[in-house]
Amino acid sequence: MKNKLPPFIEIYRALIATPSISATEEALDQSNADLITLLADWFKDLGFNVEVQPVPGTRNKFNMLASCGQGAGGLLLAGHTDTVPFDDGRWTRDPFTLTEHDGKLYGLGTADMKGFFAFILDALRDVDVTKLKKPLYILATADEETSMAGARYFAETTALRPDCAIIGEPTSLQPVRAHKGHISNAIRIQGQSGHSSDPARGVNAIELMHDAIGHILQLRDNLKERYHYEAFTVPYPTLNLGHIHGGDASNRICACCELHMDIRPLPGMTLNELNGLLNDALAPVSERWPGRLTVDELHPPIPGYECPPNHQLVEVVEKLLGAKTEVVNYCTEAPFIQTLCPTLVLGPGSINQAHQPDEYLETRFIKPTRELITQVIHHFCWH
């Protein structure tokens, strides 16, 4: 029953008080089961059918899909339930206690992005879901901050094909229709150790990596020259060499060298295409030194994403907000949800608060966010 739903600020407070940190380091990683249970119970109280889905390959993580209404199409509102870890020494407040001060709501996940679910639930108080003409879906995912395993698994397994979707990441209520992807690789070269007094008796991995880096930098130049998307502030794919390590002593021939690099592809560039370009760039080294060079993923890759600028979702949201859609450089779950339906990224709070100590959401976003959610539900589920 709707009268069982707590007030908006109490929903917000309960979400922030329920830890759901995701991290690659097992000691820091937490299940989101308690948070999913909270959300599931509230959406059931509002008359939604709720499905909780274990996400394979995770440490006890779950997705939740709440649905109401019949038929095809409809609207999907989506977000992730996890937060990043926090640095206790840099927070001046308890990360798990929602506090309000000077027009700001503080707490871990206030902006990125547990708060979005509080806004959805609050907006639905005044919506008679029994009268929806098209279905409304609410998706809460797991592990966005690490592998995006929840969104990947949902997109791979669901039969849903809504008319459109909105992911409530913090965009300061500026609609986002495209962003770059992210690929992170480790280049490893296995040499042969030996005493530095006789270089011919070994294979110096640092020297081979020097050769490989030259080819990688040529790839970087080629990407900049061949691919352009003028809407981005950096209108080409970027390639960064971020970390390198090799050798253990000045008088030993280096036996192993490892380089970590990333590429941020433009929308429309496929992961297979990028892998092919990287392998082609490194082919001269691999051919000269067979079996000594390997390329491994550091993280699951994220493709670029774009919602067609002339889609009805873009037109409706731009009209409601009086603002044009933007493109951004950070990544979200949109590439995976976009495989199901046209998708925008749009939510309260600033991306500048994401992953920051003393994270907050400004209270000025409360009224317009509630109004926006109500309006998009009316447009896509009642018309």
Curated annotation (Swiss-Prot):
Would you name any one GO CC term? cytoplasm
Q: Provide the alphabetized UniProt keywords.
A: Amino-acid biosynthesis, Arginine biosynthesis, Cobalt, Cytoplasm, Hydrolase, Metal-binding, Zinc
Give the cofactors, semicolon-separated: Zn(2+); Co(2+); glutathione
Taxonomically, which superkingdom?
Bacteria
| Known pathway | Amino-acid biosynthesis; L-arginine biosynthesis; L-ornithine from N(2)-acetyl-L-ornithine (linear): step 1/1
Active-site residues are D82, E144
For this chain's record, the cofactor binding note is: Binds 2 Zn(2+) or Co(2+) ions per subunit.
Instruction: List GO molecular-function terms, semicolon-separated.
Output: acetylornithine deacetylase activity; zinc ion binding
Q: Name the Pfam families on file.
A: M20_dimer (PF07687), Peptidase_M20 (PF01546)
Q: What is its EC number?
A: 3.5.1.16
Substrates-to-products reaction catalysed:
N(2)-acetyl-L-ornithine + H2O = L-ornithine + acetate
Q: Where does Zn(2+) 2 bind?
A: D112, E145, H355
Biological process (GO) annotations held by this record are: L-arginine biosynthetic process
What InterPro entries is this protein classified in?
AcOrn-deacetyl (IPR010169), ArgE/DapE_CS (IPR001261), Bact_exopeptidase_dim_dom (IPR036264), Peptidase_M20 (IPR002933), Peptidase_M20_dimer (IPR011650), Peptidase_M20A (IPR050072)
Q: Which top EC class is given?
A: hydrolase
Q: What does this protein do?
A: Catalyzes the hydrolysis of the amide bond of N(2)-acetylated L-amino acids. Cleaves the acetyl group from N-acetyl-L-ornithine to form L-ornithine, an intermediate in L-arginine biosynthesis pathway, and a branchpoint in the synthesis of polyamines.
Q: Which HAMAP family match?
A: ArgE
Q: Which family does it belong to?
A: Belongs to the peptidase M20A family. ArgE subfamily.
Q: How does it assemble?
A: Homodimer.
Name used for this protein in its record = Acetylornithine deacetylase
Q: Which organism is it from?
A: Escherichia coli (strain SE11)
